[in-house]
C-alpha cells in the first residue's frame, strides 16, 4: 500500500520524506483547527489554558485526539510510510510538543538561531496569546519553517512575553482548570 511502495522508494528516503510530510500534515491540521468553526470549538480547550507549561502540551479534547489520529493514519496509509519513520515522528512530535509548551526561556541569541529550524517555547508562546492575531500564528510543533513559508509567523507578542495574556479572553478564571468544564467546552456556545 501507499505511494512509497508503488514507486519503490528506498526505505531511508521514504522515512525522511514521510517525516517531513507528516510534520506538514500536523501543521496543516493545526491551521484548519483554528479556521474551521466546528474544529475550533474542539481545539479551543487547548487554548483555554491560562498557563503555558508542560501540561498545556497534553491538554487536548479526546475528540481532537481521535480526529488527529484519523488524519495522520490517512497520510501514513496514503504514503505507505515506513513504520519506523512513523514511530520516530510520533516520539519527536510528542517531545517537541512538551519542549515548545515548556515555560522555559532560551537565551534570545540562541532562540533566534534555533527558531529558523525548530519551534521554540518563546515562538510557540506567541500562539497561546489572548490576542487573536497572535493566536492565529506560529502553528508548528517540530519545524518552524512552515509558518515562515505560509506567512503565519509572528516573531514576538505585542505585549512582550512577560506582560502578554495567555489563554482566550472569553475563557478566563478558575473554571478553565476544571476537567469537566473543559471537556464540555466544545458543546458550549461561542
Briefly describe each language-model feature range.
Residues 3-162:
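Membrane-embedded catalytic scaffold of the fatty acid hydroxylase/desaturase
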Residues 161-190:
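A membrane-cytosol interface segment of integral membrane proteins
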Amino acid at each position: 500500500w501507499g505511494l512509497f511502495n508503488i514507486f519503490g522508494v528506498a526505505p531511508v528516503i521514504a522515512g525522511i520524506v514521510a517525516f517531513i510530510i507528516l510534520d506538514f500534515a500536523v501543521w496543516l491540521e493545526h491551521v484548519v483547527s483554528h479556521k474551521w468553526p466546528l474544529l475550533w470549538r474542539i481545539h479551543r480547550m487547548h487554548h483555554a489554558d491560562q498557563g503555558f507549561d508542560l501540561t498545556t502540551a497534553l491538554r487536548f479534547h479526546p475528540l481532537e485526539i481521535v480526529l488527529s489520529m484519523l488524519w495522520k493514519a490517512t497520510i501514513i496509509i496514503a504514503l505507505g510510510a515506513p513504520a519506523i519513520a512513523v514511530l520516530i515522528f510520533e516520539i519527536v512530535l510528542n517531545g517537541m510538543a512538551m519542549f515548545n509548551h515548556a515555560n522555559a526561556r532560551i537565551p534570545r541569541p540562541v532562540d533566534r538561531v534555533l527558531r529558523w529550524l525548530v519551534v521554540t517555547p518563546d515562538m510557540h508562546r506567541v500562539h497561546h496569546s489572548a490576542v487573536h492575531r497572535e493566536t492565529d500564528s506560529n502553528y508548528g510543533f517540530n519545524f518552524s519553517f512552515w509558518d515562515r513559508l505560509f506567512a503565519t509567523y509572528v516573531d514576538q507578542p505585542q505585549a512582550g512575553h512577560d506582560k502578554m495574556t495567555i489563554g482566550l479572553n472569553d475563557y478566563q478564571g478558575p473554571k478553565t482548570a476544571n476537567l469537566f468544564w473543559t471537556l464540555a467546552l466544545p458543546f458550549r456556545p461561542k
